[in-house]
Amino acid sequence: MSDIPKEPVSRQVDVGGDQSEVITVLSDPSSYSPPVPNVERIETHGALVFLAGDYAYKLKREVKLPYLDFSTIAKRESVCRHEIERNQEVALDLYICARPIVRLPTGELAIGGTGEPIDWVVVMNRFDQADLFDNLAQQGRLPVELMAPLAEQIATYHERAQPYRALDGNEVLAKVVTQTIMSFFEAGDPLELSQVHEYAGRIVAELNTQSQLLRARSQHGYLRLCHGDLHLRNIVLRNGQPILFDAIEFDDNLAKIDVLYDFAFLLMDLWHRDLTTHANHCFNTYVSKAVPTEGLNGLAALPAFLAIRAAIRAMVTIDKVSIVDENRQCEARKDIADYFSLAHQVLQAEEPVLIAIGGFSGTGKTTLAAALC
């Protein structure tokens, strides 16, 4: 693996330029055609989403982070267009187009039309925020029965995804781990350096143990162009079915990953929320649909995949701390600690357990086995 710094270094994050004029226009109900009664705004570390009428308008923040660069108009246009391409296969009825924010000859800004583009937005069909799996989970309303169709959809997504056999699966993950650990060192607070050192040592050791397996999996076609950001905030219940959206659009290399590593993000998120029964149902369905017998040995890398995903979520939440209000900062800091704790937890080896279930026909052996596994 690449060398990992032993001490913190300055964090190179460009918080970007002034998009206030564009934000003002997108926040104004009269800017839309036809005008809307009101506009709601949702903020993430990389975008601002404006909910207006039946549509949502996603504005990329003018930022440059270690893992994404939206610092110019040209880059934001490119990434908006690519977001449409990346998501239309699985979320065709959500994504509409990339649209410019233009300066009219009068000097005013408009959403679309003829004029000089000064920014870009992704236009989507709006959905009820209550139907996000993230919100359903927080409110205790996420049915475990949705885990099977969700896992089947992910299995189909992975089956259709383009493989990249020439890539080295071990090198791909090693780069992710190195970047994540460097980001932790650069961030300093809210993580103790001793915690970062401990995680770094354990995950590097685990990757070294699984290096041959990871290389073999990429050679056998398990490394593909995946979703890349497969957690509960990027799944919505629409017409009674789970829909994946918001696949990584700013760097395809971050999405060219092992299919099990892609799937691990969802498992980690369910585990993080104490939805272990949901995780088990999702895992078992996915394995039965998408993992052939010869691919079962890949499950040996699952602890590393889960740990890396938890660490990445902690890293992204660290970046979010600086852009939220004080009340939400406390919540974000707790999330960071919880994610980092989970990253340590899943790397702890546990002894396997074999359970045999017996009984007469029709007494519920299969139901009990499904609940236990």
What is each stretch, according to the model?
Residues 1, 101-107, 320-324:
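Short regulatory "switch" loops immediately downstream of catalytic or recognition motifs
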Residues 2-27:
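Cysteine-rich, disulfide-bonded extracellular modules and peptides in secreted proteins
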Residues 12, 253-256, 272, 297, ...:
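Hydrophobic alpha-helical scaffolding
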Residues 20-227, 232-312:
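Conserved ATP-binding subdomain of kinase catalytic cores across diverse folds
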Residues 84-87, 184, 318, 347, ...:
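Generic helix-packing signal
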Residues 286, 323-373:
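Glycine-rich phosphate-binding loop of ATP-dependent small-molecule kinases
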Residues 310-322:
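Extended, well-ordered alpha-helical segments in internal regulatory regions
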